[in-house]
């Protein structure tokens, strides 16, 4: 293995392809968000961040965070991940005031999220990304009542979608389809009801 330079070159090519895929996804998201003047939101202001590493549970990965807002108390992030030999994934990660703000619209769209193949994080560790049974549970296997109860009992919410690596050639389309689904939930949350879910932030139309 140490004498096989071809293996390392192949790995570098694949990692670069993942990096380019996420760059395209980030650019498409920026166009959508810019069209809705949504960059006025503090949580959408930071530019896309693409990182790569060599050791998530012993394997290389590439990760895109955009839009992204991380603080000790509050999180709003779209996290897209390529995990070597496992999957591509898209996660909507909410914590603190953002988890509270979007809870009701998430519950009311239980069926849409289930039909799209999303999973709900049931782990107490919000920084685990695998789809083991101790970490994620398929939303389509949860009743609306059970779904709501699980959301109520956690300080954070993570909704995640797994894209098998054998669907790589269609990954960009799958990512955009599900980015738009979640952005539609964000849009509904801002437009619905009498109370702005995030007081002090101007409302936006994502133009979907």
Locate the predicted segments by residue.
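Long, solvent-exposed, polar/charged low-complexity segments
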Residues: 1-34, 135-208
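Charge-rich, low-complexity N-terminal segments
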Residues: 1-71, 75
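Short, solvent-exposed polar/charged micro-motifs at secondary-structure junctions
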Residues: 48-53, 129-134, 168-173
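Short, charged low-complexity intrinsically disordered segments located at boundaries
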Residues: 51-60, 95, 135-142
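Aromatic- and glycine-enriched beta-alpha-beta binding-site module
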Residues: 55-115
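A structural detector for beta-sheet-dominated domains
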Residues: 67, 121-123, 162
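Short, internal acidic amphipathic alpha-helical interface segments
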Residues: 97-151
